[in-house]
Amino acid sequence: MDQDIHDQLAGHLSVMGMGMPHREGLVEILKENFTEQEAQIALMLPTTNTPLKPVTIEALSGSSTLDRNFLADTLEYLAQRGLIYSGKTESGEVGYALHQAGFGFPQAFFWKGEDSPHARKMTKMVLKYFNREVTKEAFGGKKTKAYRYIPINRSLNPEVQAVLPHDQMDTVLDNATRFAVAHCPCRVEAGLMGRPCEHPLEVCLKFDEMADYLIDHGLGKEITREEARVIVRKAAEIGEGVAQHSRDQAQAARNHGG
């Protein structure tokens, strides 16, 4: 098998809408997490889909000589490890997609909040890869931003602020149907580097399809709408903002503070 398969996968990941800049650091992260066979299979996943839009096994197996069951088992194994996204397609079938920057990469390494040798190694590798240049290219060099900060409803002053209804967290929560909470990747990384955050760790909210993914794969835990409101309210009380994914239907909110 081609010995540069991980470099090929890094290039594949770099051309997505919210892709990861192609650097040696990314190649090293991929080598640490994907076997050559797994990298070859990940290369089959399209780069043109928007985040959280999976493709079926049938669609993938049509262009592959691999056994269909082996392909399905490998993709599910990668999803269980948080290396790719898994969810339902519009037809209701199970499908898979690549993680995109800010939509699972590198967050999935830390959502569980584990302190393990692998988590510590990933912390060092991720921080080395996401230097200032790479971070700017991944998140600041695109017309469509992965995140935006939105106000918490009761903190609004309508006399001085004009905010559309969908920009209010209460509305986001009202419109969602399933809720999950995971550990904040930034705070987990800080703790693993010996700089523990004084704020709560389980504050990364996920909704609907993304909530399904985290709950089904053990990356986060299911909560109620009211429990999500409590997390948002507590964030407001300590002066944190809420970052929302830029999607027509919100999938995640992350509480951030100084």
What residues fall within each predicted segment?
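Long, low-complexity, charged/polar intrinsically disordered regions in eukaryotic proteins
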Residues: 1-28
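Short acidic, hydrophobic short linear motifs in intrinsically disordered regions
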Residues: 50-64
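A short, conserved structural fragment
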Residues: 79-90
